[in-house]
Amino acid sequence: MPDLFIDGEWRGAVDERTREIRCPADGSLVGVVDEAGGKDTVEAIAAARRAFDEGPWPRTSPNERGDLLLRVADLLVRDKDALARAESLDTGKRLVESEYDIDDIANCFRYFGRLVASETGRVVDTGTAGVDSRVVYEPVGVCALITPWNYPLLQTAWKVAPALAAGNTFVLKPSELTPHTAIHLLRLLAEAGLPPGAGNLVLGAGPEAGAPLGDHPDVDMVSFTGGLQTGRRLMAAASGTVKKVALELGGKNPNIVFADADFETAVDMALTAVFLHSGQVCSAGARLLVEDSLHDRFVDEVVRRASAIRLGGPFDERAQTGPLISAAHREKVEAYVAKGLEEGAVLRCGGARPSGPGLDEGFYYPPTVLDECAAGMAVVQDESFGPVLTVERFTTEDEAVRLANDTIYGLAGAVWTSDEAKAARLAARLRLGTVWINDYHPYVPQAEWGGFKQSGFGRELGPSGLAEYRETKHIWRNTAPAPQEWFA
C-alpha cells in the first residue's frame, strides 16, 4: 500500500523513490516506504490549502472537532499494541516505553478534544452602552508539522491534536528514519472521519520533502521539533512570507543536587534523567550539578549503578535501555565524549562501544559518566543527545544558578533539595521552560511545554498549545449606530 497521504488518498512518490527503514537495535529491515520529493510536498500543500479555503473542516464547530479527536483517542487505545511495536521497531526503544507513549498520546488527543469545546472566545466589557464586543478564535490556516525521530508519534500528537482542534489543515512530515506510526495515525484520522485534505502526510528527508514547507506561500505556520541548526534554517526560510513559526530545539538540561537532597531518590532519578531512551530525550538531564560536599559519594553511586545498566533490543525484557538511532548519531556522541576527554574531563564509566551477542549489529553506546567537567567544554554546552552525563561541582546557590543558566538552551531542569524555600528560590531564577523539584521528566498535557533562549519559542500542550494554532479576532458591533458628526 502506498505511504503518502495527500487529499484523502494514499499514493506513491511522483518519482517512485523508496526508503528502507531498519531497526537500530539489530539492522533488520522493518519496511520499505515511499520517499517524497519536493513535488509531492507541494501537492500536499495544495491539498491542505484547498481543504482550508473550501472544505468543511475549518467551518465545523469546536464540539464537532473535539468529538473527532476523542474518537481518535479511542482508536489509538484500540491499536495500542500495533502502534507500540511499530514505534519500537523504528526507534529501537524498549517496548514498555513505547506502550507508555501510546497511553500519553491518547491522553493528548483527549485533552485537546475536551479543551477546544471550552475555549471558544470571550465577551469584552467596553464600558460603552450600545456595543457588543467579542474576541473569537480562528484557525491559523495551513500548518506544516515537522517532527523528530526520538518520540515520533508522541511529538506528532503534540502538534496534530491542537492543530486539528483549532480547525487548521496540515501537512505532516515526520523524520525519515521513523515513519511507520505517522502512517498509522493518518489511517486512524481518516477512520475517525477527518475530511479529505485536512490531514496530509509526506515522508522523506528534510532537504527534499521538507524544504517547501518552510518557504511556500500557501503554508501559514510551521511547527518544528528537532535540532537547533535545522530550526535556524526554517526560521530563515519562513521569514520570506512572514509565516508563524513555533520551534522546540532541544536543551542541555541541568539536574541540580544539593547536599540536603534525598540521596537514594536523587541518585535513582539522576540515572533516569539522562539514560532513559539512551539519552535521546530533549529534556534529558545530561548536566549533573552536585554540591561539592556531596560530590564524591553521589557520583560514586551514580557510576556504580550506571555501569550495571543492561543494553538490549526493544523486545529484550531484561534490557533497561536501547540503541542510538543510527550509526551517524553514535559517531556524533562518540566525538563529543572524545572531545570532552581532550578538554580534561575524567571518564568514570562507559566511553567505548559495547560488544557481544545482540549488541554488535546495533548502534549501542553505553551509559557514560564524565566527571570533573568545566562549564566551557563542548560536551557540557552542546546537545550530544546520547547517554552521556557530565558532572560539575558547585558550592553555593548562586554558583548553581550561574552554572545551570550558562548555556544557550533553556528547556528544562531539576532541583533536588529538602529545603522548600531553597527550591522555590532556584525555580524562580532558572531560565528554563520547565523546572522539576525533587523529580525528573514527568509532564501532563494540561501544562505547557517549551523552552527559553535557543531552545525555541512557542508552547506545546496546555491552553497555550492550543493558542499556538489560533488567531484571535476582535469583533466590535455597534448596536445603536448614529452619526458622530466629527466632520462638518
Question: Which residue ranges define each predicted feature?
Answer:
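ALDH superfamily catalytic-core signature
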Residues: 229-374, 437, 484-488
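Conserved C-terminal structural/oligomerization subdomain of aldehyde/semialdehyde dehydrogenase
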Residues: 28-32, 219, 256, 310, ...
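A short acidic/small-residue loop/turn micro-motif
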Residues: 12-14, 18-19, 35-39, 261
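Glycine-rich loop-to-alpha-helix module at the N-terminal edge of alpha/beta enzyme cores
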Residues: 31-119
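Hydrophobic face of amphipathic alpha-helices that form TPR/SEL1-like repeat modules
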Residues: 1-26, 51, 352
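Residue-level signal for inorganic ion chemistry
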Residues: 27, 65, 87, 109, ...
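A structural signal for short, well-ordered beta-strand elements
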Residues: 20, 34, 58, 91, ...
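Rossmann-like NAD(P) dinucleotide-binding subdomain of oxidoreductase/dehydrogenase enzymes
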Residues: 121-265, 394
